[in-house]
Amino acid sequence: MWLLAAHQVLRKMQRRHSSNTDNIPPERSRSQALSPEASVDEGGVFESLKAETASPPALFSGLAGGLPASPFPAGLVLGSTAGGGDVFIPMPATRDEAGGRSAEGSTYHHRQAHHHFHHGAHRGGSLLQHVGGDHRGHSEEGVDEQPGTPAPALSELKAVISWLQKGLPFILILLAKLCFQHKLGIAVCIGMASTFAYANSTLREQVSLKEKRSVLVILWILAFLAGNTMYVLYTFSSQQLYSSLIFLKPNLETLDFFDLLWIVGIADFVLKYITIALKCLIVALPKIILAVKSKGKFYLVIEELSQLFRSLVPIQLWYKYIMGDDSSNSYFLGGVLIVLYSLCKSFDICGRVGGLRKALKLLCTSQNYGVRATGQQCTEAGAVCAICQAEFRDPMILLCQHVFCEECLCLWLDRERTCPLCRSVAVDTLRCWKDGATSAHLQVY
C-alpha cells in the first residue's frame, strides 16, 4: 500500500515537471534536464531571476566603451534561503544558441548600454574634468605667482619711485625757495670752497717740487688766502663771525639751524686757510734750515693739530643751539640732548688727540728707510735714480736691494708704503697728510 502511494506521488511529480519544462526557454530546459533537483521551488526562483541574468553585462557596459557585449553564459541558478544569496553555475552553450542569444543580447544591451554609458560617461567625465580643472588651476596659479607677484622690496621701491614722481615738483619748489632765502650764504660758501680747492692743489704741487718750489707761488697763495679771509670777515663784521674762532658767540639775535650752519661753516673755512698758510711757511723754508725729508713730519703735525682745533670750535655753538634762548621751556629735553652730543663728541675728540700724539711721536723720532748705498751698489743699480731719473744724490738702499735718492725716497714714502720698483713693503708708519694736503672735510658738529 505504501509502495502504491509512493508510486502515485512520483507520477504526479513527473507530470507536473513535464508540463513546466514545455514552456521554459531552451537554456533553462537544458539546465533543468541536467539538474532536476533545482525544480523544487515550484518555478518561483527562476521567474524572479529572468530579468537579472542580463543585468551584469549592462552594469559594465559603460566601462567597456565601444567593445562588443559578450553573451552571458547559460547556467544554473540555485536559490538558497539559509545563505541569503544565489549560487550561479555557468554552463556551456551550443553555437546556434550562442549565436541567437548574442544577437538578442546585443540588441537588448544596446539600449541599456546607451543609458548606462551616457550616465557613466557623464559621471566619469565630470570627475576627470574636476580633477583636471583643479590640476590646471593649481598650475596656472603657480605660473601666475612666480613672475606676477613682485617681491616686497620691489613693491616698496616702486612705491617710493611713484611717490617721488608725484612729490618731486613740490620738493624742487621748496629747495628753490630755500636757496633764494639763503642765496648770499650759499654764494659765499661756494666761493670759499673754490678758494680752498685751488690753494690746496697748488700747495701740493709745490711740495712735490721739493727744492725747485717757487717762492713767488707760495707768497701768492698766502696773499690770496689772506685777502679772501679779510674780505669775508669785513663784509659780515656786524655779525662778529671771528668770535667763534675764540669760542665766543657771534653777534646774532637768534640762533636757528641755518644760522648755526652759517657760523660753523665760515669758521671751518677760515681755519683751513690758516692751516694751508702754515704749511706754505714750511715749504718756503730753505734746505739749510729744514731738510726736505723732514718737512713731511711737520705737515702731518700741523694737519692733526688743525683737525683737533676745528673739532673743538663748534662745541659751544651747538650747546647754545640745543638749549635755545629760553632753556626753561625745554630744560629736560635740552639736558638729554646735550649729554648725547657730549658723549658722541668725546669719541671724536679722543680720536683726534690720538692722531696728534702719534704725529708728535713720529716728529721726535728719526726714521731710517734704509742704509747708505756704496758706489758699487749704485753702479749695479744703473747710476740713475728710478724716481727722479737723475744721478744719485745721497743714495739709500732698501731691504729689497733697490737704490734711490734719499730725498726722492722720503718723498715717495710720504705717499706710499711700498718700494717703487718691486712693491714690497718698505715702511709701516703714518703716511697721511705728509704730502702737504689739507682735509676737505667740513666740520659742522
Swiss-Prot record:
GO molecular function terms listed in the Swiss-Prot or TrEMBL record: ubiquitin protein ligase activity; zinc ion binding
Protein topology in the membrane: Multi-pass membrane protein
Keywords: Membrane, Metal-binding, Transmembrane, Transmembrane helix, Ubl conjugation pathway, Zinc, Zinc-finger
Transmembrane segments: 184-203, 216-236, 257-277, 331-351
ZnF RING-type: positions: 385-423
GO biological process: positive regulation of ERAD pathway
Entry annotated with the keyword DNA-binding: no
Keyword Metal-binding: yes
A cellular component term, taken from the record's GO annotations: membrane
Topological region Extracellular: 1-183, 237-256, 352-445
Cytoplasmic topological intervals: 204-215, 278-330
UniProt cross-references to CDD domains, sorted A to Z: RING-HC_RNFT2
InterPro entries named among the record's database cross-references: RNFT1/2, Znf_RING, Znf_RING/FYVE/PHD, Znf_RING_CS
Subcellular location: Membrane
Pfam family, any one: zf-C3HC4_2
Induction notes from the record: Expression is induced by IL3 and inhibited by LPS.
Classification via PROSITE patterns: ZF_RING_1 (PS00518), ZF_RING_2 (PS50089)
Disordered: region residues: 12-41
Role according to the record: E3 ubiquitin-protein ligase that negatively regulates IL3-dependent cellular responses through IL3RA ubiquitination and degradation by the proteasome, having an anti-inflammatory effect.
Protein name, entry field: RING finger and transmembrane domain-containing protein 2
